[in-house]
């Protein structure tokens, strides 16, 4: 009997995974050091001395949790996603190829952003965060945007300056959005006035207004709002930045940083996930 190609591929992937996993358990220092070399680091020689921590403990039942992840290492997620590829000569290559569902005002939006263009857009927003919104490293930025390139721009801008991005699905209700804003103690809200999905227009600005009322009732107030496709009379939200300025030296290629990932029990709770671990998760998978 002929074995389907898909089955053979799946078996081969499983075999490779098992081999890789076994190697990572037996030689953890070498395993992670090899992967570290695929990224750009401020101190690239650190991985030559990566060693397994014999006192490492991931299980709280066995005592105090003790984890060290690349002690002394310094890198930046946005730099690895954008600058590193630009430095390899890929600046004019597509980083994002986007085609909207309906587009704003029912005009279909098709757009290709190169690595250079994506970096330029994210730098503009990063500057806006610093100079206008007074975002500091560790501050939380809620990204309540439809599936458009600006969502990626927001994440890259946050990563660049060490802010925390908390992505909230743009189809969520005002109550769900407010819960995530309050839970993460967000300082800035990035949004759009409208969204189109499946041919249906969603008035996000109405959801946002209601969510902000709920937040204020619970004692939390969003300090700044930035709106993509802003409405002319919506003065409470700042327009998406168009001007670029030099990023402050203290923020440029900020090391580390975190993102919020959703976790579910009886209610949503954000889990802080370091950018360092995030880039290795992507590469390993």
Where are these regions (language model features)?
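A short N-terminal helical cap/helix-turn-helix that marks the beginning
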Residues: 22-48, 72-99
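Short helix-terminating capping/connector loops at secondary-structure junctions
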Residues: 90-91, 134-138, 217-226
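Active-site diphosphate/adenylate-binding microenvironment
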Residues: 44-74
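Structural core segment of the AMP-binding/adenylate-forming
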Residues: 160-256, 279
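Conserved AMP-binding/adenylate-forming core of the ANL superfamily
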Residues: 78, 92, 96-156, 173-178, ...
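Adenylate-forming
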Residues: 24, 82-86, 118, 122, ...
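Residue-level signal for alpha-helix termini/capping positions
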Residues: 87, 130, 134, 182, ...
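Short, contiguous pre-domain boundary segments
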Residues: 1-19
């Amino acid at each position: 009997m002929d074995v389907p190609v898909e089955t053979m591929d799946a078996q081969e992937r499983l075999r490779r995974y098992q081999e890789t996993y076994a190697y990572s358990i037996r030689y953890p220092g070498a395993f992670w050091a090899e992967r570290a070399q695929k990224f750009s680091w401020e101190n690239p020689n650190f991985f030559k001395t990566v060693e397994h921590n014999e006192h490492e403990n991931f299980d709280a039942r066995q005592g105090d949790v003790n984890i060290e992840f690349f002690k002394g290492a310094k890198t930046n997620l946005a730099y690895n996603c954008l600058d590193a590829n630009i430095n390899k000569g890929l600046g004019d290559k597509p980083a994002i190829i986007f085609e909207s569902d309906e587009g704003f005002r029912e005009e279909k939006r098709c757009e290709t952003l190169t690595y250079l263009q994506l970096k330029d857009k994210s730098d503009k927003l990063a500057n806006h965060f610093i100079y206008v919104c007074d975002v500091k490293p560790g501050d939380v930025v809620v990204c309540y945007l439809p599936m458009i390139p600006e969502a990626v721009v927001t994440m890259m801008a946050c990563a660049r300056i060490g802010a925390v991005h908390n992505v909230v699905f743009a189809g969520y209700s005002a109550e769900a959005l407010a819960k995530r804003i309050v839970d993460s103690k967000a300082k800035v809200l990035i949004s759009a006035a409208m969204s189109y999905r499946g041919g249906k227009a969603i008035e996000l600005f109405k959801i946002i207004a209601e969510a902000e009322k709920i937040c204020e009732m619970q004692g939390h107030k969003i300090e700044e709002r930035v709106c993509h496709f802003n409405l002319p009379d919506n003065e409470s939200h700042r327009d998406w930045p168009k001007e670029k300025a030099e990023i402050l030296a203290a923020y440029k290629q900020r090391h580390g940083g975190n993102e919020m990932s959703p976790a579910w029990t009886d209610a949503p709770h954000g889990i802080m996930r370091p950018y360092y671990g995030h880039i290795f998760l992507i590469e390993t998978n």
